[in-house]
């Protein structure tokens, strides 16, 4: 449920697209 924070994270950014 954390998409904006993921987009800002380099490790989770790949999940943003």
Swiss-Prot record:
Any one GO molecular function term: toxin activity
SS bonds (residue pairs): 6-12, 7-16
What changing residue 10 to P does, per the record, is: Gain of ability to compete with alpha-bungarotoxin
Propeptide part(s) removed at maturation, as residue ranges: 1-4
Tissue expr: Expressed by the venom duct.
- For this UniProt entry, what is the primary localization, expressed as one broad class? secreted
Compartments where found: Secreted
The yes or no answer to whether the keyword Mitochondrion is present is no
Source organism, top-level taxon? Eukaryota
- Sequence positions bearing Cysteine amide: 16
Ranges annotated as spanning the membrane? none
Q: Which UniProt keywords apply?
A: Acetylcholine receptor inhibiting toxin, Amidation, Cleavage on pair of basic residues, Disulfide bond, Ion channel impairing toxin, Neurotoxin, Postsynaptic neurotoxin, Secreted, Toxin
Q: Name one GO cellular component term.
A: extracellular region
| Keyword Lipid biosynthesis found | no
Print the miscellaneous field.
Negative results: does not inhibit alpha-2-beta-2, alpha-2-beta-4, alpha-3-beta-4, alpha-4-beta-2, alpha-4-beta-2 nAChRs.
What the record says about family reads: Belongs to the conotoxin A superfamily.
Role of this protein: Alpha-conotoxins act on postsynaptic membranes, they bind to the nicotinic acetylcholine receptors (nAChR) and thus inhibit them. This toxin blocks neuronal mammalian alpha-7 (human and rat) and alpha-3/beta-2 (human) and muscle alpha-1-beta-1-delta-epsilon (human) nAChRs. Acts voltage-independently. Does not compete with alpha-bungarotoxin for binding to the receptor. Binds to a different site than alpha-conotoxin ImI.
Q: What is known of its domains?
A: The cysteine framework is I (CC-C-C). Alpha4/3 pattern.
| Name assigned to this protein | Alpha-conotoxin ImII
């Amino acid at each position: 449920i954390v998409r904006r924070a993921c987009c800002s994270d380099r490790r989770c950014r790949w999940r943003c697209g």
